[in-house]
Amino acid sequence: GVPGDVHDEQKQHDINFLLFKVYEVLXDIXLKXVA
């Protein structure tokens, strides 16, 4: 129940979201490059 733990979870969630967006963009670039 430490506020720091909540902050770490939120930061991890943000990082996962950013990675997901990066992979999404890379996939779009790859598809466009192939097509």
Curated annotation (Swiss-Prot):
It is found in: Secreted, Extracellular space. Keywords: Copper, Oxygen transport, Secreted, Transport. Its main location: secreted. One of its GO terms (biological process) is oxygen transport. Hemolymph. GO terms for cellular component: extracellular region. GO terms for molecular function: oxygen carrier activity. Belongs to the tyrosinase family. Hemocyanin subfamily. Hemocyanins are copper-containing oxygen carriers occurring freely dissolved in the hemolymph of many mollusks and arthropods. This is Hemocyanin A chain.
